[in-house]
A protein has these predicted regions:
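Glycine-rich phosphate/pyrophosphate-binding beta-alpha loops
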Residues: 381-385, 461-468
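N-terminal Rossmann-like NAD(P) cofactor-binding subdomain of oxidoreductases
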Residues: 2-334, 342, 474-475, 482, ...
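C-terminal substrate-binding/catalytic lobe of Rossmann-fold NAD(P)-dependent dehydrogenases
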Residues: 2-62, 315-453
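A generic structural signal for alpha-helix starts
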Residues: 303, 399-400, 466-467
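A generic transmembrane alpha-helix motif of multi-pass inner-membrane proteins
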Residues: 452-453, 464-466, 476
């Protein structure tokens, strides 16, 4: 039986009037909303243990305060966080990310500290007298407008911030030949059956063949040849192209992009072949640099399993293991039975569990060569539209218990360089739909962990669309050198 988490590590005196306390805290959360928005427009992103507060309602902010109990043993109160946010709002800071949750917990655990002096010292290197931005924001182009292309569009628009560091300038796609092509593309971006309504406004500009997305004019360019796209006509220079088509995966094919004089580099949203670097942000992104002309962000499954494997190998040393991915269907499968060149995939995706192969084991060996020959993998496609599950069964060198494995992942999720990559769940009722639009590469399910001496099985959920797209954007920001510094530093 898995030991349940005790949420009452840090005790507080109970309030006499629960409703009165709630209304007080709700009012403070409501006051936070405009402050968070104002800071965002200045390039400052406010977080609560890694979760962004931007575009959150007052109730969502209160839920994020409650979430902190999963990390620290008790929730935070808006009474504790509001003064910190208010002080930050009065400071003149360079663009950065500030986790007010981590700041407040540090203050609560070190009551001798003067809060104003601590915050001032913590953010000292970010103080400025005037803004320092590049003369021109870096241009980004998305090549392809399918599932990943549209989700990337949503993320890039939402992360634009002050708009001084980078901008999504264009989307390149094949011309459907339909008179209302642009209107239909806007409709697909505006409403998504899995991820819901777009959080903002989308206007169609037929004259310029562009969409105005939350104030960002994004040109739609029709082409089927990367070398011949006339980016110059749209004043696009030294662009980074994100190729989400999957049509070209080797150096010869992807180099078509960089042969275009307006393109500086290309980032592939699929596993790259040959000598192309496959990068999983948080694990081997140190091998990616602004000098690379072609990079690949590997696959959604690779991004989900590699951080978990590295963490276990670093702490317990993997002898061997097997990975079974329970993967939501994709548009590569057939809605009803029909011909498909791959075995079994011709059968209806909506009606069957489909056993299929996966390149996950080979991908692991590319990124973690120390595990070459130690890992096998297979996949089962299931009739759900989104969110997948990696079941990782491993033999490790020494005996290890469930609590030790869980604590290893908990620390990684909240206080390591993997905190942007790994999420941690304590829920005893978690199911796949709970993780729609989850921002992390994987969510470690602590309640499902099994250990039998040196045999360990862990379960990792992952949004194979949104979580993966977030990883792509993290890698993009790294190679563009526009990642925001995060405070307080670990």
């Amino acid at each position: 039986m898995v030991k349940r988490f005790n949420p009452d590590k840090r005790r507080r005196p109970k309030v006499d009037d629960y409703f009165g306390d709630w209304k007080w805290r709700e009012a403070l959360a409501e006051s936070m909303v405009p402050i968070v928005g104002k800071l965002y427009r200045s390039g400052i992103r406010i977080l609560m243990y890694g979760r962004p507060l931007l575009n959150c309602s007052a109730l969502e902010i209160m839920k994020l305060h409650r979430f902190v109990r999963e990390v620290e043993g008790n929730e935070l109160s808006e009474i504790e966080t509001y003064p910190v946010l208010e002080q930050i709002s009065k400071m003149k800071l360079m663009p950065c990310e500030i986790d007010i949750g981590e700041m407040v917990v540090h203050l609560l655990e070190n009551k001798q500290l003067d809060s104003e002096k601590y915050i001032d010292k913590c953010l000292a290197e970010q103080k400025r007298t005037k803004r320092s931005y590049p003369l021109r924001p870096k241009d980004i182009v998305i090549y392809g407008f399918g599932r990943i292309g549209r989700i990337l569009t949503r993320i890039l628009i939402s992360d634009t911030g002050a708009g001084a560091k980078w901008r999504l300038r264009a989307i390149v796609l094949r011309d459907s030949g339909h008179d209302d092509d642009l209107i239909k593309r806007a409709g697909l971006l505006r409403n998504d059956s899995v991820h819901g309504a777009f959080p903002g406004t989308i206007r169609v500009n037929k004259q310029n063949n562009s969409l105005i997305i939350n104030g960002n004019e994004v040109s739609f360019i029709y082409s089927d040849n990367p070398k011949k796209v006339k980016y110059k006509d749209f004043d696009i220079k030294r662009a980074t192209v994100i190729d989400s088509t999957g049509v070209w995966r080797d150096e010869e094919g992807l180099s078509q992009h960089v042969k275009n004089p307006s393109v500086e580099r290309v980032l592939l949203t699929a596993p790259g072949k040959g000598k192309i670097k496959n990068i999983v942000f948080g694990v081997n992104d140190d091998k990616a640099s602004s000098e690379d002309k072609i990079l690949a962000a590997a696959s959604c499954t690779t991004n989900a399993i590699v951080p978990a494997l590295k963490l276990i190998d670093d702490n317990f040393k993997i002898v061997n293991g097997h990975i079974e991915t329970v993967h939501s269907f994709t548009n590569d499968q057939n809605l009803i039975d029909n011909f498909h060149p791959s075995d079994r995939r011709g059968r209806s995706a909506a009606l069957n569990l489909v056993i299929t192969d996966t390149g996950a084991a080979k991908a692991v060996a590319k990124i973690l060569p120390e595990l070459k020959g130690k890992i096998t993998a297979n996949a089962i496609r299931v009739p759900t539209p989104n969110v997948s599950l990696a079941i990782i069964s491993l033999t490790v060198k020494r005996g290890v218990g469930v609590d030790e494995v869980n604590e290893c992942f908990r620390k990684a999720a909240f206080s390591s360089n993997l905190r942007e990559t790994i999420d941690y769940s304590n829920s005893i009722d978690a199911v796949s739909s709970d993780y729609y639009s989850n921002e992390f590469a994987l969510v470690y399910d602590s309640q499902a962990t099994i250990s039998n001496f040196n045999n360990v099985t862990i379960y990792c959920w992952y949004d194979n669309e949104y979580g993966y797209s977030r990883q792509v954007v993290r890698l993009l920001k790294k190679v563009l050198d526009v990642n925001l510094l995060r405070y307080p530093k670990q």
